[in-house]
A protein has these predicted regions:
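Short glycine/proline-enriched loop/turn "hinge" motifs that connect secondary-structure elements
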Residues: 81-85, 253-256, 260
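Conserved Rossmann-like nucleotide-binding pocket used by diverse enzymes
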Residues: 92, 194, 259
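An alpha-helical support segment within catalytic cores of ATP-dependent transferases
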Residues: 2-17, 120-193, 206, 246
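Conserved N-terminal boundary motif of the eukaryotic protein kinase catalytic domain
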Residues: 18-25
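Alpha-helical structural elements of signaling/regulatory helical domains
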Residues: 71-74, 101, 166, 236, ...
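ATP-binding pocket architecture of kinase catalytic cores
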Residues: 25-147
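Active-site Asp-x-Gly
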Residues: 138-141, 145-150, 159, 190-193, ...
Length: 260
C-alpha cells in the first residue's frame, strides 16, 4: 500500500514548501501506469506509479519532459521529483487541468510542433536509452539517420520479436527490409528533437485551449517519424497537418517513407 506521506515529504523537500495532501484521487494513467491526483487544496500534482524496477523508466521520462519544455513551443507538464515508495516507483509532475480544443487548437498544435522540430543537433539518438510505452528504446548516438533507424528502431524491434517467439513471414519480410533499407530511405534529414510517441492519446488541450503533449519517448531523429505517429488511430485532423506544412513543409517522398 502506498504511503503518501513519503511522497508528500519528497514534494515538500523539492519545492521548499509544506505539503499536506488530501485524499489522493485515482485518475487514468494509461494502460501501463497508475495515475493519481494529489493535492492539498492549493496545489495539485499528478503522480504516476509502477513497479520499483521501472524507476529508470520514470527518470528517463522526466529527462525527456525537461528537454521538450526547454523549447517553450508546446505546453509540457513539468516533472518535479521521482523515487521509490513501499516497493513502487513514482514520478511526480505538474497537474495540468485539461479542457477542450478551441476551433484553432489543432492548427496551433501543428504550428508549434514544427517549431519544436527546429531544435536540432548533429547526431541522431539521445543522451540515454528510454522507453516507448514500457518497451525499451535504445538511443545510441549515430551521425547518420538510416543506420540509426535500421539498428536502433527496426532492427531492434525485429530482434525483440524473435526473442519473444515471433517469427514466420513477418520476421522474414522484416529481415529482407533490413537488407535493402538504405535504398528505401534515401534522404538525409536533420536530427530534430522529437516527442517520440505522438499518437492521439498523448496530445490534449488545457483549459485555455493551449495544446499539451506528454508521455514522451524523446530522442533526436527525423521529424517525419513524429508526423507518421500522429497519423495512427485516426490522425490529428486536417488543420493540424496544414498548419505544420505551412510552418515547415515536409520533404518529397514522405508518404512513402512514413510506412517505415
Amino acid at each position: 500500500m502506498t504511503d503518501w506521506r513519503i511522497i508528500a515529504q519528497h514534494i515538500a523537500q523539492t519545492t521548499g514548501e509544506a505539503f499536506n495532501p488530501q485524499e489522493p484521487r485515482t485518475m487514468g494513467g494509461g494502460c501501463i501506469n497508475t495515475g493519481v491526483r494529489l493535492g492539498d487544496g492549493r496545489r495539485n500534482y499528478f503522480v504516476k506509479m509502477n513497479r520499483a524496477a521501472l524507476l529508470d523508466m520514470f527518470e528517463a521520462e522526466a529527462d525527456g519532459l525537461r528537454a521538450l519544455a526547454q523549447t517553450r513551443c508546446l505546453r509540457i507538464p513539468q516533472p518535479l521529483c521521482s523515487g521509490l515508495c513501499n516497493g513502487e516507483s513514482y514520478l511526480v509532475m505538474e497537474f495540468v487541468e485539461m479542457g477542450h480544443s478551441t476551433r484553432d487548437g489543432a492548427a496551433l498544435a501543428g504550428e508549434r510542433l514544427a517549431a519544436m522540430h527546429r531544435f536540432t543537433q548533429s547526431e541522431f539518438g539521445w543522451i540515454r536509452d528510454n522507453t516507448i510505452g514500457s518497451t525499451r528504446q535504445p538511443n545510441r548516438l549515430m551521425t547518420e539517420w538510416a543506420p540509426f533507424w535500421r539498428e536502433n528502431r527496426l532492427g531492434f524491434q525485429l530482434e525483440l520479436a524473435a526473442r519473444n517467439g515471433y517469427g514466420g513471414s513477418l520476421q522474414h519480410k522484416g529481415e529482407r527490409l533490413l537488407e535493402h533499407f538504405p535504398v528505401l530511405l534515401e534522404h538525409n534529414p536533420e536530427a530534430s528533437l522529437l516527442h517520440g510517441d505522438l499518437w492521439g492519446g498523448n496530445l490534449a488541450y488545457d483549459t485555455t485551449g493551449q495544446p499539451v503533449i506528454f508521455d514522451p519517448a524523446v530522442y533526436y531523429g527525423d521529424r517525419e517519424t513524429d508526423l507518421a505517429m500522429t497519423e495512427l488511430f485516426g490522425g490529428f485532423g486536417r488543420r493540424f497537418y496544414d498548419a505544420y506544412q505551412a510552418a515547415w513543409p515536409l520533404s518529397p517522398g514522405y508518404s512513402t517513407r512514413k510506412t517505415l
